[in-house]
Amino acid sequence: MDNETSTPDIFQWCVSPFSKITLKRSMEQRDIVEFRIDATILRQIFHHGFPDLSFNLMVITTDRKVFLLERTESFHYPRVVERIKRGQECTKLVETLYQAERDAVRRLTAEADIVPLAAVKQDDDRPESIYIFPGGHCNGNEPVLSTLLREFREETTIPLKTTELRFHATKVYGIWIHDFAVGKTFKNFVFPVKINLSSAAIRDRFRETRHTRNPTFVDIGKSHRQSLLDLVIKVQKIMIL
């Protein structure tokens, strides 16, 4: 499977992966890699830009919930529409779409019969919603910390200050998403961070955007026996397709 991104210098600052867990469903495999870092490494990462990678926040609220966003559009819908316009086959991609998007594609192809959509199940095991962490790619050499703050504001309409955030200073997570529909691997770095807001406060201040809607919160409980890796795995089980 081809890598969507090359290995950047960021790995020079991270020690060897401490542990790796693999989750797999019908559309994806996700490798969760735990990296041990320190405050110096974290500052170095935050002050550099890596446009080939995606950087995301795993936000933990004051009432101990992890904040997720629902995508308004599935990942591959634009690609499906483009392929239909070109008369190209895209059945595998259609299987990844929201049901409303599948219905729209059926209407687009009803006369041309470009894609054998009748074979696409309406009751498969993929989630009704596609959840993401706030985050995205650096704009050129934009520092990672600036990227995280900008993306959070763009995806939630909520501005944040660094003083409102408490990043985990010893761990960062790599989420390598192997997308079976397109045969590519997408590399994401996830930074656990505690935020000085409750889930109710985020919900009240959130405004739907072009790409995101429906702020969703995963209760992580009050047990101190759960490791941070356990929490990451719990949330990824909800996010994986």
UniProtKB/Swiss-Prot annotation:
Enzyme class comes to hydrolase
Name the positions where Mg(2+) binds: 151, 155, 204
At the top level, the lineage of the source is Viruses
Short name of any one Pfam family annotated for the protein: NUDIX
Query: Which GO terms of the molecular function aspect are on file?
Result: hydrolase activity; metal ion binding
Enzyme Commission designation: 3.6.1.-
Question: Which InterPro entries does the UniProt entry name for this protein?
Answer: NUDIX_hydrolase-like_dom_sf, NUDIX_hydrolase_CS, NUDIX_hydrolase_dom
Disulphide bridges: none
Where is each Nudix hydrolase domain found? 50-241
Q: Which UniProt keywords apply?
A: Hydrolase, Magnesium, Manganese, Metal-binding
Q: Where is this motif: Nudix box?
A: 136-157
Give the record's family classification: Belongs to the Nudix hydrolase family.
User: Which protein is depicted?
Assistant: Putative hydrolase 080R
